[in-house]
Amino acid sequence: MSYIVRFTGLLLLNAFIVRGRPVGGIQH
């Protein structure tokens, strides 16, 4: 279940970063 938590955390963090910053410089 560790990988699930890590995957969810990564998705949340990625979504938060994309929402906080305009998509253009970092498109991962």
UniProtKB/Swiss-Prot annotation:
Top-level division of the source organism's lineage: Bacteria
Gene Ontology biological-process annotations: L-leucine biosynthetic process
Cross-referenced Pfam families: Leu_leader
Alphabetical UniProt keywords: Amino-acid biosynthesis, Branched-chain amino acid biosynthesis, Leader peptide, Leucine biosynthesis
Record's function text: Involved in control of the biosynthesis of leucine.
Protein name: leu operon leader peptide
Protein encoded by which gene: leuL
